[in-house]
């Protein structure tokens, strides 16, 4: 489907020369003299190469049809990460390139939004937070309650984060998936 270049936003998927690109940033530039242009910074989905393109705002760009659906994470193996559509029970395998930084936060049975193009996974959207267990952290020292200093900790998925001094190993905590930061102690 052709759309005006000026209508593209971050996250849009564009088909250029038979290859898919995801828009990382889109900026409409209106110079004092001349034609307004749209500057697109994109990443090629197949190999991760970043490209920058400039279009007149009225130019038409081929927008790829992307299907965003809920999928349940099943497991990962040498082939990739396996997901199931809970409505049709169809299974899809996403590669490590598609999953990227989301890999440590995937848990069996977790519902994620998987973006596909022609039934090939191209992007994943995790839930905003996950509950993980602290496996290792320094013991808290008495009398440190006045300061708001955080201490390093290792989560059950191997990711390092910082937690308040009263959190001990074995405690379940809520973690933001976008940056791995501590939110709160998990409620049982």
UniProtKB/Swiss-Prot annotation:
Pathway: Protein biosynthesis; polypeptide chain elongation
InterPro entries named among the record's database cross-references: Elong-fact-P_C (IPR015365), NA-bd_OB-fold (IPR012340), Rib_uL2_dom2 (IPR014722), Transl_elong_fac_P/YeiP (IPR020599), Transl_elong_KOW-like (IPR013185), Transl_elong_P/YeiP_cen (IPR001059), Transl_elong_P/YeiP_CS (IPR013852), Transl_elongation_fac_P (IPR011768)
Disulfide bonds: none
A biological process term (GO) from this entry: peptide biosynthetic process
UniProt xrefs under Pfam families: EFP, EFP_N, Elong-fact-P_C
UniProt cross-references to SMART domains, sorted A to Z: EFP (SM01185), Elong-fact-P_C (SM00841)
Residues annotated as transmembrane: none
GO MF annotation: an example: translation elongation factor activity
Keywords of this entry: Cytoplasm, Elongation factor, Protein biosynthesis
Location relative to the cell: Cytoplasm
GO cellular component: cytoplasm
Top-rank taxon: Bacteria
Family listed: Belongs to the elongation factor P family.
Entries under HAMAP family matching the protein: EF_P
Main function: Involved in peptide bond synthesis. Stimulates efficient translation and peptide-bond synthesis on native or reconstituted 70S ribosomes in vitro. Probably functions indirectly by altering the affinity of the ribosome for aminoacyl-tRNA, thus increasing their reactivity as acceptors for peptidyl transferase.
Protein known as: Elongation factor P
Species assigned in the record: Caulobacter vibrioides (strain NA1000 / CB15N)
Gene that encodes the chain: efp
């Amino acid at each position: 489907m052709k759309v005006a270049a000026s209508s593209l936003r971050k996250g849009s998927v564009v088909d250029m020369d038979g290859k898919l690109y995801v828009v990382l940033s889109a900026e409409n530039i209106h110079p004092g003299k001349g034609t307004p242009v749209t500057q697109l910074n994109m990443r090629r989905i197949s190999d991760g190469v970043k490209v920058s393109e400039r279009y007149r705002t009225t130019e038409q760009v081929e927008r790829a049809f992307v299907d965003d659906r809920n999928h349940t994470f099943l497991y990962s193996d040498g082939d990739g990460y396996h997901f199931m559509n809970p409505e049709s029970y169809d299974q899809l395998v996403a590669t490590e390139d598609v999953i990227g930084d989301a890999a440590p936060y995937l848990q069996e049975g977790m519902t994620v939004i998987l973006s596909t193009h022609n039934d090939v996974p191209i992007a994943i959207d995790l839930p905003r937070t996950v509950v993980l267990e602290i496996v290792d952290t320094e013991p808290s020292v008495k009398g440190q309650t006045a300061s708001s200093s955080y201490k390093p900790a290792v989560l059950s998925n191997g990711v390092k984060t910082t937690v308040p001094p009263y959190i001990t190993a074995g405690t379940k905590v809520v973690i933001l998936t976008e940056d791995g930061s501590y939110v709160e102690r998990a409620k049982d």
